């Protein structure tokens, strides 16, 4: 059972209090949405998390897994500077239409400043999705791993392996490095990080 299955267990007032009490450590608000993570609560935990992000002035990161809710419903709610992780996930709930084109809601989200993060985990990254997105001029903003005990021995292994997967997909080495250093630092409003300058 995902942590957001029962919205009564979410504690938005406590989250705001804790975030404000330690601004050097708490850099954003994260919520997990999808059939596995939020189940019968659907998209409601995202509504609550957005309110917490607004109250704290922090960016929001949203995990997406299998539907419901749909990819479109999730990205439609995200604001400029918010981050969608597991963005190149496979069907169902891929950012691609059945014909392989990028969904209009995904294009609109990027145009308004939503950031797209790989969050490569065990089942949250698909080569076909990544190939289709990048071929259509939609590379990820952030390349990160979602490494844990179930994927450290594959398919993730480590961050360097995750980064290397984007070379054969057509991203340049400087683009890949920026997506793993400079861009995520800016996403968490710490532009002083992620650079040797």
What is the predicted function of each stretch?
Residues 9, 64-68, 186-188:
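Short gly/ser/thr-rich secondary-structure transition/capping motifs
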Residues 17-18, 75, 196-197:
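Short secondary-structure boundary/capping segments
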Residues 31-132, 136-153:
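Active-site core of metal-dependent hydrolases
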Residues 1-33:
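Divalent-metal coordination cores built from histidine and acidic residues
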Residues 5-9, 13, 23, 39, ...:
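Electropositive phosphate-/nucleotide-binding environments in soluble metabolic enzymes
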